[in-house]
């Protein structure tokens, strides 16, 4: 199947920080702000963390609406991106302010699952790299949360 490339899901434009080591960046005056108040960060010669989140969340919601329109509610689809993009999308789906997104861990090649419904997004998994995801073939149905959290997903 066709896999489009969406530039709105590319990593943050770190500008002059691009390609530098984390240990080197940690010596910059901006580093503590990146860690504690990312919503206030504009990378020198790059973009702001807030604009990165706005474009990536808009792209995910746009793709989700298009897949639902074409394949129906509960359609399962995949987006592949980078850590800060994924963390910012998860923060939005969890209703977290961008300043809290550093609390979310996203490992390389991990899977996070968000389902957008009419009333709100629901987060089904974050940062997982274990287990069989075949239960997704049944689709994910979001609506009101079950009382007591429900009994989890039913295996196919």
Regions found by a protein language model. Give the residues of each.
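Short, solvent-exposed coil/turn elements at secondary-structure transition points
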Residues: 9-11, 40, 112, 117, ...
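An N-terminal RHG(E/S)-centered segment typical of histidine phosphatases
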Residues: 16, 24, 28-29, 115-156
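Short, glycine/charged-enriched secondary-structure capping and boundary segments
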Residues: 18-21, 92-96, 138-139
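Short glycine/proline- and acidic residue-enriched helix-loop micro-motifs
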Residues: 30-51, 147-151
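A non-catalytic, amphipathic alpha-helix used as a structural packing/dimerization or gating element
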Residues: 51-58
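Active-site-adjacent alpha-helix immediately C-terminal to a catalytic or transition-state-stabilizing loop
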Residues: 58-120
């Amino acid at each position: 199947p066709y896999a489009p490339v969406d530039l709105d899901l590319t990593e943050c434009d770190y500008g002059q920080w691009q390609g530098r080591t984390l240990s080197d960046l940690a010596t910059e005056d901006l580093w503590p702000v990146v860690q504690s108040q990312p919503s206030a960060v504009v990378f020198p010669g790059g973009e702001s963390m807030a604009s990165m989140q706005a474009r990536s969340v808009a792209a995910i919601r746009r793709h989700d609406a298009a897949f639902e329109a074409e394949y129906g509610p509960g359609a399962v689809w995949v987006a592949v991106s980078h850590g800060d993009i994924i963390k910012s999308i998860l923060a939005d789906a969890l209703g977290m302010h961008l300043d809290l997104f550093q609390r979310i861990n996203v490992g390389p090649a991990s899977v996070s699952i968000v389902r957008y419904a009419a009333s709100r997004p629901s987060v089904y998994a974050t940062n997982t790299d274990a287990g069989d995801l075949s239960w997704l073939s049944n689709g994910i149905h979001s609506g009101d949360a079950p009382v007591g959290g429900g009994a989890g997903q039913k295996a196919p």
